[in-house]
């Protein structure tokens, strides 16, 4: 429930809400107002160890629960999430800042991930081939791997945890969850509803905190696998540290997603698509469009319409339905973003829409309005770096070939989009672009939960992505059985 009281956040270990054994806490502000709404503990190693012990004990019985029974239990959780959609969206807007419309969309995508997890019996099925030799049969069986952990970011406090723990638990594992210390309230509610669904104690454990919790997870010998979503430097650290300690790791990292706009595109829909991709959720998402490579032939017309429509966007508190761009997560991030905008100006890019100059009354929140640069090149920081904000760079290219070449020069390769009505252009783009997720006239090419989610290059560290069959393979181990009977 959302209240006006300042909340003292707790950990959830072995089926109980418990105080952290540490004394250090961090304030959690509402990004739209700057007012403190909670204090979250920065838990020490000892709390992680207790959570792992609880998960390890629960694994002994949970892993033996029949697969269909685990799925039925998850279906009860799914129903509770659906019944509480409105409340969950409001919590997201309160602590993350994104508009209620965006938060509602996130809730739905999270629910879809749990829907996938309820179908685990089908996804866990093995393979068999009888009579591989005289009187000998061969088969492959999938088993859970033990205690696994998830480390999740602030920008999707519901969807990303629900990519992880429902599927892992459906596969028979037990889970230790560490969500962002910037958005601890939604994590609490997810865990509350999980246990309302009747799960045994210790199957899911929540440890709040910062880097100490991350390091404790990565170094704990009883954790078999770690799922991570976050920035590129931290993803690299998580992957290298986790694998060094013998763990499976999937680490989804940063992005600099490009869109190529062709002269044969539907101009109106393309403009609205780019606006939605670049500026919704305040640009704080790894699938946001941050660079548009527009072909010269349509560049001026496209930019004129894009700028005019962008200037109509309202900035402010996400609870107000007229606002399109909410606040950034913290004052420190706002200052970082303003630094990037200033660097773009200093480097010679043309500032067409200046998000530093917000006309709406935005109070004390951490607001930066939609920002558009033209005349950007690959030498500029605003082209190279993940800004994670409503900042869009425009690069003019002569044709599709140059647009693809430009896009592939980025060190990131998460998502890429082409806007076109020409099937051959779409085919050429699909076959030659280096990105893990590709959209053709699709603004945000984040796949549905039954497909894998992962990028390439510096956008992903690991072998198996989240969701779909990739997720099931990550959270299970194979046993190949060759048998003969006398």
Curated annotation (Swiss-Prot):
HAMAP family assigned to the protein according to its UniProt record, in alphabetical order: IolA
GO molecular function: malonate-semialdehyde dehydrogenase (acetylating) activity; methylmalonate-semialdehyde dehydrogenase (acylating, NAD) activity
Pathway assigned to this chain's UniProt record: Polyol metabolism; myo-inositol degradation into acetyl-CoA; acetyl-CoA from myo-inositol: step 7/7
UniProt-listed InterPro entries: Ald_DH/histidinol_DH, Ald_DH_C, Ald_DH_CS_CYS, Ald_DH_N, Aldehyde_DH_dom, MeMal-semiAld_DH, MSDH_GmP_bac
Catalytic residues in the record: 286
Organism this protein belongs to: Bacillus cereus (strain ATCC 10987 / NRS 248)
Name of this protein: Malonate-semialdehyde dehydrogenase
EC numbers, comma separated: 1.2.1.27
Cross-referenced CDD domains: ALDH_F6_MMSDH (cd07085)
Record-linked PROSITE patterns: ALDEHYDE_DEHYDR_CYS
Family (UniProt): Belongs to the aldehyde dehydrogenase family. IolA subfamily.
Family annotation (NCBIfam families): MMSDH
